[in-house]
């Protein structure tokens, strides 16, 4: 298939993982891959103005190009600040 690339789009929740394979034109962007996957219609909690995205665990912009075989990942927002959680655990273990 000249001019076409295959890309996976992933979105994971604690209880379920979504992994969609899409075929796009060469030069397609991260945003185009996400829209083609149908995940925005399937999961209304995904907001591309708020959710961060990446390609194989590396941060990416919606305007970045995707390549054949890439896995585009949509990240959920953090529920708690990791630094704060570490501080609380350290305090708790110090009080034992």
From Swiss-Prot:
Signal peptide: none annotated. GO terms for cellular component: plasma membrane. InterPro entries: Mopterin_synth/thiamin_S_b, RnfH, RnfH_sf. Pfam families: Ub-RnfH (PF03658). Does not function as an antitoxin to the upstream RatA toxin. PANTHER family: UPF0125 PROTEIN RATB (PTHR37483:SF1). This is UPF0125 protein RatB. It comes from Escherichia coli (strain K12).
